[in-house]
């Protein structure tokens, strides 16, 4: 069980990294932030770059602790949350 005070580790890849201006940040969101969707809304308010990164959520994918996640996926202290563009194969 993670320490209730442990921050979330947020990873940004590709153009999300460029728009937010960072590849990694450690954040402690408000206790009311319990899902990926709530986290995205909170992160979008951190800066203009964050708002731009999350402006079109159809082009953003997420993983929590290296498992693909949906907006309703729960997040909590100590989790690693990664944001990246859709992956394509060929």
Predicted regions located by residue number:
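Ubiquitin-like/PB1-type beta-grasp interaction modules and other compact soluble beta-rich domains
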Residues: 1-89
């Amino acid at each position: 069980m993670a320490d209730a005070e442990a921050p979330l580790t947020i990873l940004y890849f590709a153009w999300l990294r460029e728009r937010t201006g960072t590849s990694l940040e450690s954040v402690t969101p408000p206790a009311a932030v319990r899902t990926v969707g709530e986290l995205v809304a909170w992160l979008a308010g951190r800066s203009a770059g964050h708002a731009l990164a999350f402006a079109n959520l159809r082009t953003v994918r997420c993983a929590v602790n290296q498992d693909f996640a949906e907006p309703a996926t729960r997040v909590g202290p100590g989790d690693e949350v990664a944001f990246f563009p859709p992956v394509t194969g060929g």
